[in-house]
Amino acid sequence: MRLAVVSDIHGNLPALEAVLAEVRGEHVDRVVNLGDIVSGPLWPRETAALLRAMSWSTIRGNHERQLLALPADRMGPADAFARARLAEEDLHWLAALPATLDLGDGVWCCHGTPASDLQYFLETVTPDLDRDGSPGVRAATAAEVADRLGAVTAPLVLCGHTHMPRAAQCGGTLVVNPGSVGLPAFDDEHPYAHRMETGSPHARWALVKRAEAGWQVQQRLTAYDWEFAAQRAEHKDRGDWADALRTGRVGRTEVEACG
């Protein structure tokens, strides 16, 4: 079995189209989309329209939950931008998406962790300061990953949310985060102020294959016209997103929490 795994598209249509072109060349059996699909100052409605036409296995992320449930005055700007531009059929599609998904064949999907769409699975934020004096983010320990797995025992668990491509073996389970298709850096205030940065503007996704020895993962980087996406963000008065899209780092201004 060959799976293409994507997550955290955040309405970045040109990044999605570039990844889709690569996926089509891999002859995969299934494409899995792990949520946070449309929120952001880019192309939410166009992204939703493209994905609704795909027969992908898709779950919702925290941003789908927020833009569907929160009143407009309590939404963050990324969710509010998307919510104002989505058609009714887009909202119905998002509302029907499950929070988690058991694909069978030993594959289980969540956005954050099995328990929460806001929890980091393979990273841990600590109050310890890194070299630039900011709270640090480190790879989660084996014990932390095992605790976050909870009762899930599938051989392959797919997660997103942190935008960081990473994989970790925990006993008999391989946990894979494909990174973000649409936004390579953001910062957040919880549980401590921190940054998640890939350090490059590429779209990220993963190719996961089952072999005799078990599941194997290839983390993929896809080039696309990120300058076009950055200019779109600037046109929508989101210089923070433009910086992240161009560099893979939080730049002149902070990028709102978009995990």
Describe each region flagged by the PLM.
Residues 2-10, 106-113, 175-179:
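Active-site-proximal beta-strand elements of phosphoester/diester hydrolases
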